[in-house]
Amino acid sequence: MIDILDALTEQRVLPLLVVDDPADAVPLGQALASAGVRLVEVAFRTAASLESCAALCSVPELSVGAGTVLRPQQVAQAAEADAQFVISPGTSEAVLEACQRHGVAAIPGVATATEIQRATELGARTLKFFPAERLGGVHTLSALSGPFPQVAFVPTGGVDEDNMAQYLAMPNVAAVGGSWVAPRSAVRAHEFAHIAQMAARALRSAATEVRSPG
């Protein structure tokens, strides 16, 4: 099983991919890999998601996660497609148990202290903070660092190139997630060279950010 926290901490930006045509998955993955991306999340939001996930997994440089996973059956499908981790918008004990059974890493989503406590009781330590900006962004994450020092967050939702530095400076943020690295419209338009440029820029920017002391 992938050490998801180490992988996230190394890359610091997790591209969220929404793919409508499975034929776009491999060239998209190759473009991202050429920019230095090694970790991606493909959202299970379209009819093409599962096939696209499997296609992305065929790109040897990439470790692929299934995102927007809501049910245990989707965990099984993701594992069958060779996904190495699963991300959910919320916390489901059934989904976490399925991840354990299928040997894939899990990143459940949280929005409140109660949900964080529940997720940690279930054994999770790397959590998606969603929707980050609407929940108060870095100010809320700072407040949560006191009672939950053991948790590493992946803020997603409203995080973009303009504000990611604020998040990456937080000591309890492992990485930020977002679709701005590979916008759905750019994937549809087959703008893979442009996506590679955006991904490379995001990785360079993330690499320069230094966490504040915890």
Residue locations for each model-derived region?
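Conserved N-terminal beta1-alpha1 strand-loop-helix module at the mouth
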Residues: 1-84, 101, 161-162, 188-214
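Catalytic cores of alpha/beta
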Residues: 28, 71-81, 114-122, 139, ...
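Glycine-rich phosphate-binding active-site loops on the catalytic face of alpha/beta enzymes
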Residues: 85, 89-95, 128-137, 172-194
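Shared catalytic-loop signature of beta/alpha-barrel
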Residues: 118, 134, 139-157
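Hydrophobic faces of well-ordered beta-strands that scaffold small-molecule active sites
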Residues: 13-17, 40-42, 64-67, 86-87, ...
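Hydrophobic secondary-structure block in the mid-to-C-terminal portion of proteins
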Residues: 146-212
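Short, ordered loop/turn segments at secondary-structure junctions
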Residues: 44-45, 69, 91-93, 111-112, ...
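Histidine/lysine/aspartate-rich catalytic loop segments that bind and position anionic ligands
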Residues: 92-126, 130-135
